[in-house]
Amino acid sequence: YAFLLHDRESGQSALVDSPDAKAIRAELDQRGWGLNYILLTHHHWDHVDGVDALRQHYDAKVIGAKADAHRLPGLDRAVSDGETFDLFGAPVHVMDVSGHTLGHIAFYLPDSQAVFTADSLMALGCGRLFEGTPAQMWQSLSRLAALPADTLVYSGHEYTQSNAAFALTIEPDNAALQARVAEVNTKAKRREATVPSYLREEIETYPFLRASNPKVKA
């Protein structure tokens, strides 16, 4: 997934991750928007592949992790964990969520009650460990879980149905999980997105965020 953010007052737009320049340009053109910022979560090609092509058409500033600067295309501003920057007059908090990769960051927008997690925390899952350690991923998931429960989680991939099937093998008697799996399967049949999800849902149904529960430990 890539996500477009638009500020009606200023007319400015931002993009979180850039997998497919052609599709993103088509959406921007359809809406009559320009592109002012590109926020990158990590260096994997399916999150940065469209950056160079988009920059040929838009004067967009690229923002990404300082720790990943050597692997991010066209980086204009390098940000670090704990840093806050302004986007459309609202704060964006940078969170280190290493694990899937080293240097992976999430963007938390408290005023919008949204966090863009890409391949760290997903709907009922998390990204595979390519570079980080299990301890790093656990720390990252724990940090994200500490955000307000009504935060919307915008993750990077539509893996929810397979993640749900795995979660059921861990907690088959979790009523909240059973209900969510049914909803996910219904959406899959309709070819509807399951992203974003509420952080509350992840805490109630995702086993890795429920590791302190005796049933999950068993």
Show where each model-derived region lies:
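Hydrophobic residues in well-ordered beta-strands that form the structural core
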Residues: 16, 62-64, 116-117, 155
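Divalent metal-coordination and catalytic microenvironments
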Residues: 5, 17, 42, 54, ...
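Active-site HxH/HxHxD metal-binding segment of metal-dependent hydrolases
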Residues: 13, 20-96, 180-184
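Accessory terminal helices/loops
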Residues: 139-152, 161-218
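Active-site metal-binding loops of divalent metal-dependent hydrolases
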Residues: 18-20, 43, 67-68, 100-101, ...
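Conserved beta-strand hairpin/beta-sheet module of binuclear metal-dependent hydrolase folds
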Residues: 1-34, 106-118
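Anionic-ligand binding patches
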Residues: 109, 117, 149-160
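Core dinuclear metal-dependent hydrolase active-site scaffold
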Residues: 4, 84-110, 114-115, 146
